[in-house]
A protein has these predicted regions:
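The feature captures the conserved acid-bearing segment of alpha/beta-hydrolase catalytic domains
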Residues: 33, 148-205, 371-430
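Post-His helix in hydrolase/transferase enzymes
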Residues: 88, 216-238, 309-310, 436-448
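Catalytic histidine neighborhood in serine/cysteine hydrolases
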Residues: 3, 70-71, 202-223, 292-295, ...
């Protein structure tokens, strides 16, 4: 993360126009649009008193730098969150869903991972939110001020980074995690921001990631926040790695192995959250075992409706590109959840030349059906779609060996149904997320990667 230097004051800006839109748990969303095409999405959480003119002006400054800003009234959401059933709360899922929905509503050409901003109590909430989410869910975090008095009615479910809430007199307070899953720009003393509660609470949270606390003397909060967003966009652009022309239009991430000569290449077809925590955890384990990983984001590829053949053609292009670069490499297709159900569908439709390079497929917690478009709202329960393709017949027809992995707690797993002889079924402790032990999941996959005899030359 970064602690930014102060920015000189600018002229006072008029209150920008804000569009209001109702959305379920979040009540009224406050939308601030850029003049042209958005360069990124910002999810902005208000302070404890709700969305007001201060946040309107800050959102307007962000929009002036090209951000599409979704303003969220924190008190409204916290009231509705407290009324939900369940032992613990998972706000990261709710917020990810609203990000997907609003970008689909706005007609974004592809999904862009949002930057999360919080003001005052919204800063403390935003920290807990990003700490809970799998790595890759949010592009980054900016906190203005801090409010150590934030309390949740229920425990916040632990995420991949561990617990971020602790019991406190019948409620739950935010506690720091050792490693935040996204880049954090803390501005504890930004102009106009509140720091409430013991300063030690703030220091503990910031020290957890090695930050140094010092006051920022920026006299103009809007200019400072706008400049922070602009710097963040520049950093994102600078970190982007250009892909070769023949695969430049595909949503792939290339991760070389930490050892070995890339004689095995795994194409990971992600879950519907895109290149995130579980997929990255598997990639790390495979990398350590000498496997090159190509992550294929279903969130981006299936943002618009595709066909089974189009999906197979995209994977065939990946195989062709890396197969040319590494002529002795063998490939395996690995998918999780949404992506797992696509593995047999894609494998069965690959051109012969591509399929001959594929040793097999691994399905991690597959659904019974494969679908070919991201449907907003599917993140909170299985939904049948008319265009869905049952994968049972695809498994039966597979010309490559398959491994079906499920959590021992997934009593309704597709893997537990009768499977053909060429499908190996493997169980691991936990449910759909495998208790967050992605290293164990990755190690299991590495040990069970399918193999085939090389075709005769």
């Amino acid at each position: 993360f970064r602690v930014d230097a102060p920015v000189a004051a600018g002229a006072a800006a008029p209150k920008p126009p804000t569009e209001l839109l109702d959305y379920g748990l979040f009540g009224t969303l406050h939308l601030s649009r850029p003049a042209g095409e958005a360069s990124g999405t910002v999810l902005f959480f208000s302070d404890r008193d709700g969305w007001n003119e201060r946040q309107d002006r800050l959102a307007g400054a962000l929009a002036g730098e090209g951000a599409f800003v979704v303003g969220i009234d924190l008190p409204t959401y916290l009231r509705k969150l407290a009324g939900l059933s369940g032992k613990c709360s998972y706000p990261a899922g709710h917020v990810e869903e609203v990000a997907h929905w609003i970008e689909r509503q706005e007609g974004f050409a592809t999904y862009t991972y949002p930057l999360v901003v919080g003001d005052g109590m919204g800063a403390t909430f935003a920290y807990a939110l990003v700490a809970q989410a799998p790595a890759g869910t949010f592009a980054g975090l900016v906190t203005l001020g801090w409010d150590g008095t934030l309390r949740f009615a229920k425990e916040i479910c632990a995420g991949d980074a561990g617990a971020m809430s602790a019991a406190d007199n019948g409620a739950y307070r935010v506690v720091p995690v050792a490693h935040l899953p996204a880049a954090w720009t803390p501005k504890p003393f930004a102009s106009g921001a509140r720091v409430t509660g013991l300063l030690a609470d703030v220091r503990v949270a910031f020290d957890a990631t090695g930050a140094l606390i010092h006051p920022l003397a920026s006299p103009e909060a809007r200019a400072d926040l706008a400049a922070t967003f602009a710097r963040w966009r520049r950093n994102e652009d600078a970190e982007h790695v250009a892909l070769p022309d023949d695969v430049a239009d595909l949503p792939i991430t290339d991760i070389p192995p930490t050892k070995g000569d890339a004689h095995r290449i795994a194409i990971i077809i992600t879950g519907d959250g895109g290149w995130a925590g579980l997929d990255r955890g598997i990639a790390a384990a495979l990398n350590a075992d000498g496997v090159r990983v190509i992550g294929f984001s279903t969130l981006k590829f299936f943002w618009h409706k595709q066909t089974p053949d189009a999906a197979a053609q995209a994977i065939a292009r990946v195989i062709a590109h890396y197969g040319k670069t590494y002529p002795d490499a063998r490939f395996v297709l690995i998918g999780y959840s949404f992506g797992a159900s696509l593995v047999p569908v894609v494998a069965n439709r690959l051109p012969d030349a591509a399929r001959e390079r594929v040793d097999g497929g691994v399905l991690i917690s597959p659904d019974d059906e494969a679908v070919f478009e991201i449907h907003v709202g599917d993140w909170f329960g299985s939904t049948h779609h008319a265009e869905a393709m049952p994968i049972g017949p695809e498994m039966q027809a597979s010309k490559v060996p398959l491994v079906c992995v499920h959590g021992a707690d997934e009593s309704d797993s597709f893997c537990l149904k009768p499977q053909p002889a060429h499908v190996k079924v493997v169980a691991l402790p936990g449910g759909h997320h495998y208790n967050g032990d992605y290293a164990a999941l990755g190690d299991l996959i590495a040990r069970n990667l399918p193999t085939r005899n090389r075709p005769a030359k």
